[in-house]
Amino acid sequence: MLAVVGAAALVLVAGAPWVLPSAAGGENLKPPENIDVYIIDDNYTLKWSSHGESMGSVTFSAEYRTKDEAKWLKVPECQHTTTTKCEFSLLDTNVYIKTQFRVRAEEGNSTSSWNEVDPFIPFYTAHMSPPEVRLEAEDKAILVHISPPGQDGNMWALEKPSFSYTIRIWQKSSSDKKTINSTYYVEKIPELLPETTYCLEVKAIHPSLKKHSNYSTVQCISTTVANKMPVPGNLQVDAQGKSYVLKWDYIASADVLFRAQWLPGYSKSSSGSRSDKWKPIPTCANVQTTHCVFSQDTVYTGTFFLHVQASEGNHTSFWSEEKFIDSQKHILPPPPVITVTAMSDTLLVYVNCQDSTCDGLNYEIIFWENTSNTKISMEKDGPEFTLKNLQPLTVYCVQARVLFRALLNKTSNFSEKLCEKTRPGSFSTIWIITGLGVVFFSVMVLYALRSVWKYLCHVCFPPLKPPRSIDEFFSEPPSKNLVLLTAEEHTERCFIIENTDTVAVEVKHAPEEDLRKYSSQTSQDSGNYSNEEEESVGTESGQAVLSKAPCGGPCSVPSPPGTLEDGTCFLGNEKYLQSPALRTEPALLC
């Protein structure tokens, strides 16, 4: 085993010997020197050198201890050995903690002092052994079965999924080598020639530890005679709804039947035989077409492998090349659901994927004005979009979908259209507030001006309203105030009325003349008469018109009783006139 590895051993050189008190008679026995430890997988090799004492009588013993243990433990394979090397395994120790070794020389009852090496962590100093390889030949392919380093050991027990393998294959008669990289324990190398001898070798690699093994021993194998039944090739898988569609190439005849099987992805990453781990697909058994459809529920793992076999009567082809399927790459998620938040000139769009397989994918949205057909597309690796520099108070519509371009150049369907109206911008808001302020201020100013105007009109131009006495006069029925005119000329007789509060006027008509009588508590004839022009209006209407003369006229009496406060005389056509506006002094009544 060690000769195969051929790797430089890790040499742990001991420092200056630590001399312990020797046993009786061992004063001249020196401890071993140049102690080093070489580890490959779980196999330890401890080496040292002696000082040239007679090897026939000197033996050596080794002990070890770990960081978790203060007590030194004996190495069973390294007790009282006569050689300067011993090999052993420590399967029960923790390879991730520091371990320390020491060796001493012994001769009879005498022993040397112990010579210790510096502590080290076995996991980081261990080497990987070449993987074990087993070959299986077909007519046009070779199956390579690989066992990882330290198959049943403790050193790489947790690292098996991290190993990758490099396979070098060549025809025995040629030096042209082909390199194949694999992460599986079984690798099928197709497209070989029948009845041809191929040789190959394999090495293991641990990328994170930056370690690799040596190549395994070269093995050669010959492919078989070409099979009468060709192998189905060019397997393709597509997803349609909730089903998978498996297609392959084959020059089929009417009697050729096909069957397909699937293998969970994790099964190929485990060592050992897996021929019994392939599972049949019921809807792809004994089909005559070069395709079959099966439900996604048939396969319950996220990753799996497919292969197809052809048969005709008693003849059966080899299994096709294994097709790796990642369900995340083939199953399209449903259309996403979007939410849109509107701002003044911005729309915030969040794309909510409806399936967990959307993780790590890209997203695309398209948006446009509701009144336009010009669409704008945006693509991101995240579900959040910000649409800036939009028009305020404008309706925009948005759709989104999930992209698989990095994997299979496929996309989901677009989501439902969602339309949202942007809010007023800051500039529009200022103008709206300013406009409302101007309108409000204008209304207040107009109202104030109107109030001032009404006040000025009331003060400077009071309403021309007749006195209350005239209002009361005109409030009587017209028929009672009419004075019938006759063709005869009549005279007016005036009387002086003194100290009167009430003036009663009675009008009587006679066929020959108009007779007017005045009654009062006290009356006295002044002997003064006043004639005024008589004004006649509308003889057709038959109404008498009052004539008025300024006080102090022909009557020569200042402010005579019977006048109004504004100094106006009136004709005595009234039947009754009673008003506090009449003066109590003697007045001239015409």
Curated annotation (Swiss-Prot):
Transmembrane segments: 430-449
Cytoplasmic face residues: 450-590
UniProt cross-references to Gene3D superfamilies, sorted A to Z: Immunoglobulins (2.60.40.10)
Name of a matching Pfam family: Tissue_fac
Region Important for interaction with TYK2, residue ranges: 483-492
GO biological process entries: cellular response to interferon-alpha; defense response to virus; gene expression; positive regulation of DNA-templated transcription; positive regulation of interferon-beta production; positive regulation of interleukin-1 beta production; positive regulation of type II interferon production; response to lipopolysaccharide
PROSITE patterns associated with the record: FN3
Modified residues (Phosphoserine): S526
Chain residue ranges for the region called Disordered: 514-545
A single GO molecular function term of this UniProt record: type I interferon receptor activity
Positions of the Fibronectin type-III domain: 31-125, 127-226, 230-327, 332-425
Posttranslational modification: Ubiquitinated. This leads to its internalization and lysosomal degradation. The 'Lys-63'-linked ubiquitin chains are cleaved off by the BRISC complex; this prevents receptor internalization and degradation. Probable ubiquitination sites have been identified in human, but are poorly conserved across species.
Disruption phenotype: Mice are protected from the lethal septic effects of intraperitoneal LPS administration observed in wild-type mice. Double knockout with TREX1 does not show a visible phenotype.
Disulfide feature: C78-C86, C199-C220, C284-C292, C397-C419
Compartments where located: Cell membrane; Late endosome; Lysosome
One term under GO cellular component: late endosome
Membrane-side (Extracellular) residue stretches: 27-429
Annotated membrane topology: Single-pass type I membrane protein
Entry-linked SUPFAM superfamilies: Fibronectin type III
Family, similarity comment: Belongs to the type II cytokine receptor family.
Identification of the protein by name: Interferon alpha/beta receptor 1
